[in-house]
Swiss-Prot record:
Family: Belongs to the universal ribosomal protein uS13 family.
Signal peptide positions (record): none
Name of the protein: Small ribosomal subunit protein uS13
Function per UniProt: Located at the top of the head of the 30S subunit, it contacts several helices of the 16S rRNA. In the 70S ribosome it contacts the 23S rRNA (bridge B1a) and protein L5 of the 50S subunit (bridge B1b), connecting the 2 subunits; these bridges are implicated in subunit movement. Contacts the tRNAs in the A and P-sites.
Any GO molecular function: rRNA binding
Gene name, Swiss-Prot/TrEMBL: rpsM
Residue segments, region Disordered: 114-137
């Protein structure tokens, strides 16, 4: 398996799909990375290696081209940096006590969804309340 941005990407998949296994890279960004890599590859190596396309499988890519992919992918915010940024944004919302921050703190849906009947994913499993037994009868 090839390693890009400290993530093992699957060998048997196309490069665009394999790059999507990295947090923060979707299909459009993966396509953009492949296009930039193809341009850089042509400048650096010329016709030495087959030109990278969206349909190229990861196992068909040699180490030099993989290094170019790593360099291009490094320019984007992914994995740990992106996780940290998202968490700091949520922490900021909680600290300023805005509506979204309060919803995050309470563990309720943030984006205006109705919670009367649904929202079980965000609220967690139902908590049943025990009925009191009558004493003295």
């Amino acid at each position: 398996m090839a390693r890009v941005l400290n993530v093992e990407i699957p060998n048997h998949k196309r490069i665009v799909i394999a790059l999507c296994s990295i947090f923060g890279i979707g299909k459009s960004l993966a396509t953009e990375i492949v296009e930039k890599t193809a341009k850089l590859q042509e400048e650096k190596f010329g016709k030495k290696f087959p030109i990278l396309t969206e349909n190229t499988k990861v196992k068909e890519i040699n180490e030099e081209v993989l290094q170019v992919i790593r360099d291009v992918a490094k320019t984007y915010k992914t994995e740990g940096d992106l996780h940290r940024e998202v968490q700091s944004n949520i922490k900021r919302l909680i600290e300023i006590k805005c509506y979204r921050g309060i919803r995050h703190r309470k563990g309720l849906p943030v984006r205006g969804q109705v919670t009367q009947k649904n929202a079980r994913t965000r609220k967690g499993p139902r908590k049943t309340i025990m009925a009191k037994k009558d004493k003295g009868k």
